[in-house]
Amino acid sequence: MTSSEFELIQHYFTGLGEGAAVRLGVGDDAAVLQVPEGHVLQISTDTALEGAHFLANLPAADIAYRSVMAAASDLAAMGAVPMASLLSLTLPKADSAWLRDFSTGLGAVCTETGLPLVGGDTTRGPLAITVTVMGSTPADQFMTRSGAEPGDRLCVSGTPGDAAAGLEILKGDLSVADASISAVLAARFTRPVARLILGQTLRDIASACIDISDGLLADAGHLATCSGVAIEVDSSLLPLSDALCSVVDMQQAKDWALAGGDDYELLFTLPCNTPLPAGCTQIGRVVSGSGISCDRVPERAGYDHFAH
């Protein structure tokens, strides 16, 4: 690299976001965080590779934004309050314009999520971004994938399927005449929103929770396996957006909602008498047994990194 690692960090990655938990941030050998008394720490990490997780021509600001939101979504699924983030960035070269754009997107998403950047690493190689996020909850109030029980309702936030349509638009495989609809769907892929506030609400009422990254059916399968139950999904109940339904037929819209992935919505189970939070929809139920069932099974049920 033409710039030293120290110069890169100082120039592009210092002062991105603020957080009450940060005692010491970027610039020392390690960061120092203050965990609130009576709380426990949640930590998660996500790696994004060019070509596997984002398109080669995606703007650097969008790559940064998407990478942090994907990691933050794991905190949302636990019901955690965000504290801080770490970034490990592998670059083929030190491109000042690319780094400036990346830093802009990174600063925006760190501020929006409450995940100030407190450290990380840079090295040379094929483009890859690893984001580690930290959050906290009261010691006995975090969510897991393992609490669903027969009789619970299966619910989802938002409108899954939009991100899959957005990816097809960005790849040039889906042509949309209405530029505003095209932009809305593309943004669902490039600029997802981690449901952090919803997650903090759900931790008091949900029996189990997971974020949708691999696809709704695949992630429902994770809930079922971890909880030792069976889950039934009713595709007629899927909350499909008007934008999605305006660009593809109903069957394709359902398939993307069930298997598209990259939605970063929350999929969760609620006891039968618990009120459903605003912006969420019941799409199935938990029963005794194992596995998942659905009246419609897409050709590909979800993303598997090692299936190809």
Describe every region a protein language model picked out:
Residues L24, A56-A70, A94-T104:
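Glycine-rich anion/phosphate-binding loops
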Residues M1-G15, P92-P116, T123-I129, M134, ...:
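Glycine-/charge-enriched secondary-structure boundary and capping motifs
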Residues V131-M143, S180-T201, D249:
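Active-site glycine-rich loop that binds ribose-phosphate moieties when present
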Residues V35, L41, A48, V81-I169:
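Glycine-rich anion-binding loops of enzyme active sites
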Residues S67-M78, G107-C110:
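A short, N-terminal amphipathic alpha-helix
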Residues V32, A71, G79, L117, ...:
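Residue-level signal for inorganic ion chemistry
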Residues M1-H53, N57-P59, M78, L87:
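Extreme N-terminal cap/leader segments of soluble proteins
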Residues A164-S182:
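Short, compositionally biased
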